Amino acid sequence: MTGGQVKVFGKAIQTLSRVSDELWLDPSEKGLALRSVNSCHSTYGYVLFSSVFFQHYQWSPSATITDSDIPLNLNCKLAIKSILPIFRCLNYLERSIEKCTMVARSDRCRVVIQFFGRHGIKRTHNVYFQDCQPLKILFEKSLCANILMIKPRLLAEAIALLTSNQEEVTFSVTPENFCLKSSSGESLDLTSSVYSEMSFGPEEFDFFQVGLDTEITFCFKELKGILTFSEVMHAPIAIYFDFPGKPVVLSVEDMLLEASFILATLLDYPSRTSSPQSLRLSQARRSDPTLSGAQEGKSRVSQTPESISRAAPKRLFPKDPPDSSSAAETRRASASQDDISEVPESVVSDMEEGQSPSPLRKFSCMFFGAVSCEQQEHANHPLGSLAVASDSEQDASG
């Protein structure tokens, strides 16, 4: 690698250091992949440098399976604190380094990194690794309902409005608008906190596709890291997401490399105006004039300062207009049904009286599908996850 390539490679390591204290070097025939995943499995980072990114790239399998001759890749698990100081001063390396070589020695379990500078100066670093299989995530980002592509400089200017101690950021999208705002958490205290919000029109994006009006909240630290990396690459950043609780993907693609960050989003069930089941049900009712006519006969529940209730679902073809007493009975009966799309929040609040309050805002672990107990009781179709929950997590969530 030359000095400019060392800067890009080092910036990728710095970006992945925001995710975890461990880094995997995963060489293959396609190129060199850098992987990182945090301890709670809520953030996954992946950067693939193609073979043409390097001036010279040579790969050979560490071993082969005798029966089928399947090559086995060399998996190098490094401590981020051992490799990060080597690529800390990137501007200095870009100016002073003429060539950089990296050689992985499977027999000695170490990676040898050499810098060749001016005036014959040579620096050698021996980084020992552990042969460990990296975690690989299969997530089809192209199937997401919302796909946005924007220049990193424009998004970086927007997040500059957020405070430095901000931990989470919220994206809110509609077909006419994109809104970036600081997450207010459980409550917004205007006397002791700063709330920032910025809106963009579709014309500000290179690509703007919104198939689902939604609002997602995720960690702010990883967003800043991939924005810095995309600015170095001078490539637009693509954002793929659906609804709260499903992962959001931040991706940067170039002819020489591909970078993707998969982040878990905050599952805020009470604040969601419509679940995916209710969206599909509403679309089916709009397509059927008979069902849409029956929808107009549904009664509405009065709103009080203590609790705001949604309309309780009833039969699609009511014979008589329900009175107030039948509406109350329907609300009580709807709590025991399993095939409804929504549950009135007043019923949930009545069921939770006398119990200790538990936070409903929770990050959904995208690998083990950890969701709140309230959603498991009232949602007919739980959010999709990339792997089945373990037995210990099922006992804890129950």
From Swiss-Prot:
Coiled-coil ranges from the UniProt annotation: none
Segments of this protein annotated with the region Disordered: 272-359
Gene Ontology CC entries for this record: checkpoint clamp complex; nucleus
Residues that bear Phosphoserine: 349, 358
Transmembrane segments: none
UniProt keyword Nuclease, yes or no: no
Biological processes annotated in GO: cellular response to ionizing radiation; DNA repair; DNA replication checkpoint signaling; mitotic intra-S DNA damage checkpoint signaling
Keyword field: Phosphoprotein
Phosphoprotein is among the record's keywords: yes
Superkingdom as given in the UniProt entry: Eukaryota
Xref: CDD domains: PCNA
One Pfam family, short name: Rad9
Segments of skewed composition (Polar residues): 272-281
Compositionally skewed regions (Low complexity) per UniProt: 324-336
Family of the protein in this entry: Belongs to the rad9 family.
Assembly and oligomerization: Interacts with HUS1, HUS1B, RAD1, RAD9A and RAD17.
PANTHER family cross-referenced by the UniProt entry: CELL CYCLE CHECKPOINT CONTROL PROTEIN RAD9B (PTHR15237:SF2), DNA REPAIR PROTEIN RAD9 (PTHR15237)
Official protein name in the record: Cell cycle checkpoint control protein RAD9B
Organism of this sequence: Rattus norvegicus
Gene it is expressed from: Rad9b
